[in-house]
Amino acid sequence: MSIGKGECLVLSGPSGTGKSLVLRAIADLIPHEGDISLDEKLCTRAKPEDWRHDIGFLPAESQWWFDSVGEHFKQFDKNLFRQLGFDESVLKWEVTRCSTGERQRLALIRLLQQQPKALLLDEPTASIDTENTRQIEKMIKEYQQQHEIPVLWVSHQQEQIKRIANRHVMLKNNQITEQSL
């Protein structure tokens, strides 16, 4: 399976078919076989710390280790925060005050500030409302087009797949069963 620059490939399929495992293997979070390349450089034979920062991984539920939102950000990119509906005051918020949608939008900002060369998105809008979903989709598409990066997105939502995918791959029993444009 390969993904071109600026392409959004969506993986879908029944629960338990390995969609999230594919993302975790690419992000080198689990042992795997096969080769992974980014910008024509073979990653799997290099040290993970040499390339892992180039891959941005956003899980369905983001991790928050500190109490305040501001402790999670080394820098404040006004444009990214504004595009997702925040101003500087959000840095003073307690993480527990944030809704699930706000946490996902903040996690996306945190990820994009790292300027990844590829995005791995594991159902990033699965448990959030329509407004937050559309904001996240729009931001990812804009970033992807601006930086011409590949995006591998796991989704179960058929309408979302139609909106975001350049290509769609269905998995069943840990195998690719169908591909479409």
What do these predicted ranges mean?
Residues 34-43, 51:
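Conserved ABC transporter NBD signature motif
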Residues 94-98, 102:
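Conserved ABC ATPase signature
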Residues 154-156:
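H-loop/switch region of ABC-family ATPase nucleotide-binding domains
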Residues 119-123:
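Catalytic Walker B motif of ABC-type/P-loop ATPase nucleotide-binding domains
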Residues 54, 61, 66-80:
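Q-loop/switch helix immediately C-terminal to the Walker
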Residues 108:
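Hydrophobic anchor residue at the start of the ABC signature
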Residues 27:
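Helix-to-loop junction immediately C-terminal to a conserved catalytic motif
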